[in-house]
């Protein structure tokens, strides 16, 4: 298993003028990895992220399920509404329509039967959004809620089980 990380910037993994991190993954990162012999499709790629990256991993798996074998999201930054997202981060979505198009909860059915693992601490400000997502995830998804906040301590504690989850699904 190879681990490749990217920084999706501050645009919440959806297209903005001059920035499209999802296109960067599809058009640049995956082809580069394939040239190196890593993550050969179909479905030998897993996505994982923390906070905004966790949201991005889920969004990527929803938009490109044919590419993704499994997905893990640690404290995914999932807003429950466009006004909430706009108030907290005005640059996250260009419009209410962009939020609706990229709402991980609304589009969770696109995950199909894809193995999914999500984790969030009860003290995480994104817990309400992650909890809403957990209610609509595919059957068999692993949901890990417990004590913790949106911080490095919680993230670090969730990295080993998330990586093990992905490795287990890539090995099959």
Question: Which role fits each region the language model picked out?
Answer:
Residues 1-172:
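Non-catalytic cap/lid and distal C-terminal segments of serine-dependent acyl enzymes
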């Amino acid at each position: 298993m190879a681990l490749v990380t990217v920084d999706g910037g501050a645009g919440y993994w959806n297209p903005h003028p001059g920035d499209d991190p999802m296109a960067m993954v599809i058009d640049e990162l995956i082809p580069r990895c394939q040239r190196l012999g890593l993550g050969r499709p179909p479905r030998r790629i897993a996505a994982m992220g923390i906070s905004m990256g966790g949201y991005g991993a889920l969004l990527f798996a929803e938009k490109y399920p044919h590419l993704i074998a499994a997905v893990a999201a640690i404290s995914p930054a999932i807003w429950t509404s466009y006004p909430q997202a706009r108030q907290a981060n005005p640059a996250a979505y260009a419009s209410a329509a962009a939020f609706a198009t990229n709402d991980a909860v609304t589009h969770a059915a696109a995950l199909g039967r894809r193995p999914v693992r999500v984790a969030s601490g009860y003290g995480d400000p994104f817990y309400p959004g992650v909890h809403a997502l957990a209610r609509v995830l595919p059957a068999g998804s692993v949901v890990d809620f417990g004590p913790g906040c949106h911080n490095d301590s919680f993230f670090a504690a969730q990295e080993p089980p998330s990586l093990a989850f992905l490795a287990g699904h890539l090995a099959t």
